[in-house]
A protein has these predicted regions:
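Small-residue-biased structural context
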Residues: 1-185
Length: 185
């Protein structure tokens, strides 16, 4: 089993490559059904990946890395992606702005990946430098990823929570106010 496990950074980088490949395939696709299928795969992969980072990797980094701002920026970048993912999951390729939303999501994800993987100063480099047990984190990420994939298979994508958009959750592509910030009438 140890030979098949990946450290956390290797696992997250593999996820990055998979999503980049799906975006590349979308750019070359012409048929609506193919585009919709690719977007569903992209959204599923991103949902799982963001959940893994937010539940396991980012908290471990927040406690140990030198530049805490990088972790906070990552949460905000995820929240922006979650809005587009929620919108795309409720859309079809013929909808207005569909292709533009996929394009913007691709740009945002590629920027996020570049920041995380930046040599020497990105979050992954900082995690290594801080001495995090990346093998143990990798095992936790793999176990949680399997749970999430099984959950998605049986129940569909979960409702995603935003962290930096205080008091909001996303349903059908729109922020839903939790009642925390209500005005007295």
């Amino acid at each position: 089993m140890a030979s098949k496990s990946m450290d956390a950074v290797a696992l997250l980088k593999a996820d990055h490559r998979k999503v980049e490949d799906l975006f590349d395939k979308f750019e070359k696709a012409h048929e609506s059904e193919r585009k919709k299928s690719l977007v569903e795969q992209i959204c599923t992969e991103l949902c799982v990946h963001m959940t893994l980072e937010e539940e396991i990797f980012y908290p471990a980094c927040q406690a140990e890395v030198e530049d805490k701002d990088v972790v906070e920026e990552s949460y905000v970048e995820h929240d922006g992606a979650k809005v587009l993912v929620a919108e795309l999951m409720e859309s079809v390729p013929d909808d207005e702005f569909y292709a533009a939303k996929v394009s913007v999501l691709s740009e945002e994800v590629r920027h996020h990946v570049k920041e995380e993987e930046k040599r020497g100063e990105g979050l992954f480099a900082q995690a290594r430098k801080a001495g995090l047990d990346l093998d143990a984190l990798g095992e936790r990420l793999m176990a949680r990823k399997q749970e999430l994939m099984e959950q998605i298979e049986s129940q569909g994508l979960p409702t995603m929570q935003t962290r930096s958009f205080t008091g909001h959750r996303l349903e059908q592509g729109r922020p839903v106010h939790s009642g925390i910030h209500t005005a007295a009438g």
